C-alpha cells in the first residue's frame, strides 16, 4: 500500500512537471511566433502597434499649439519643452501644449543648442548670446564680433564662435555663471564647436578656404591648459584629406569626439584618431547626435522586402552588431537626439529608440513641414499648428 502510494505520488509529480514544461514551451513558441510575425509582417506589426501597444498617434489625438509657424523664427525642442521664438517673445510649452513660461528678448536670427536642462541661444550674425536653465534666463551678454556657432554641455559651459574681427574666427568659452574662461584665435573659418560633458575638452572644426580645394582640420583642446595659454592647449588634431566634407562633430562618453564626414565616421580623443566606419555610396543620411554611436540610412539595391531603405544604428564599438530598422515609404529627413531617432516620412513620423524598435508613430492627413525632437518629446511642424507627443 505504501509502495503503491509512493509510486502514484511520483507519477503525479512527473505529470505535473510535464504539464508545466508543456505550458512553458507553448508560451515560448507562441511568443517567438508573434515576435517573428511582428518583425516580418507590416500589417500585423501596425495592428499591434496601434491597438495593443498604442504606439500610433493621429494628429487628432496629439496635443496642438495653434500658431502661424511661418512667423516663428525658431522652433526648438529641449528636455521636456518646446521653445518658439516670435515677435520678441520666447515661449515655452510642455508636452500638453500648455505655455509654461515666457521671456522677452530681442533676437534677429536665433540659433540654439541644448544639453539636458540647459539651452543656449545666439543671434546669428549679431552679438547677443544667452544661457537658460529650466526655462529661466541664467545670463545674457553681447560679444565682440558676429556670432556664427554656439554650443553648450550638460553642465552649462558655453562655447561661441564669432567672425567679423581682425581674426578669421574667435572661439570663446564661458562657465555656467557667464564668466569668460578663455578665448582661442583661429585663422580659419569655424565649421563647428563642442564641449565634452565633463568640460575637460573643447573641439573645434575649421575649414581652410584659401586653396582651390578646401580642407578641414579638427582640434582637440584641453580646457584646463587653455585657461593659461589657449594657443598651446591643443592635445590632438586631425587633418582631413582634400574635398572631404564634414557634416558634424559630437562628444560622446566624455573623452571621445565623433566626427561625421561624407564617406566615413572618425573617433578622435587625446590618444588617437581612428576611422571607425566607412560609409557606402548607398548611404542617404547620417547623424551622430547620439549619446553613444551613430546612425545612417542606406538605400538597398536589392531586397525581398517592399522597403528600399534601412535605418542602421551603430555602436562606437566596431565589434558590436548594428541594429536595423526597416523603413516603409520615402524618407524626407532623419534627426536624432541622445537615445531617440525621428524618421520624417512625409505625412508621418516614426520615432525609433537606440535599440532599433519603434517607440511612437505619428500620422497626419497633410504633409509635415519639419520635425524637432529632444530625448523627451517630438514636435511636428505644420503651417498653422505644431503637434507635440511624449516619447
Where are these regions (language model features)?
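Acidic, serine/threonine- and glycine-rich low-complexity intrinsically disordered segments
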Residues: 191-308
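Hydrophobic membrane-insertion alpha-helices, especially the h-region
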Residues: 20-39
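A short beta-strand motif characteristic of beta-propeller blades
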Residues: 53-67, 96-104, 135-142, 178-184, ...
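Hydrophobic beta-strand positions that form the internal "hydrophobic ladder"
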Residues: 81-82, 119, 157-159, 199-202, ...
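Structural motif
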Residues: 40-46, 89-91, 127-131, 166-172, ...
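Repeated scaffold domains used in trafficking and secretory/extracellular systems
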Residues: 66-76, 105-117, 145-154, 186-197, ...
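N-terminal Lys/Arg-rich, disordered targeting/topogenic segments
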Residues: 1-22
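Non-cytosolic head/periplasmic domains of membrane-anchored proteins
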Residues: 106-208, 212
